[in-house]
């Protein structure tokens, strides 16, 4: 009884989205496109999680910042074909931040931000914070890839501007709904 009252959304997120094992309709299509063939198992697992998150939360807009092969954004786009999504693949800090600012100003708010592998993750996070709303959520990749990023992730978790956070070891999830108690969860995902 206490679990239903205290943790319904978080419990559902963990049990029905993060730990979900059922094959989704788009997995086969994405595999045919070749995205699953060359990815290591853990990357495929993360991309499928990204698919399930977008499938559940249905953001109207998604911005991905980072350098990659396009597999993550392909999984997320497959979950919501009506979503306005853009990938900013800049290696140039100033140019990428300018593109991000322009896109955020165009959208007026950010529903979902995926901070993938980028050396200027802190600046991307701070820039996007001005555009969050209670339903906004961020996906932060590689939260343990360096000592500096680990330290920064701890700062994000402690930041009063964020609400609930999830540490999935390879990625971090940040939610901004202040109607819920600030809480940090460590989930054994990988």
Summary of predicted features, one role per range:
Residues 1-134, 144-190:
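A short alpha-helical cap/connector motif
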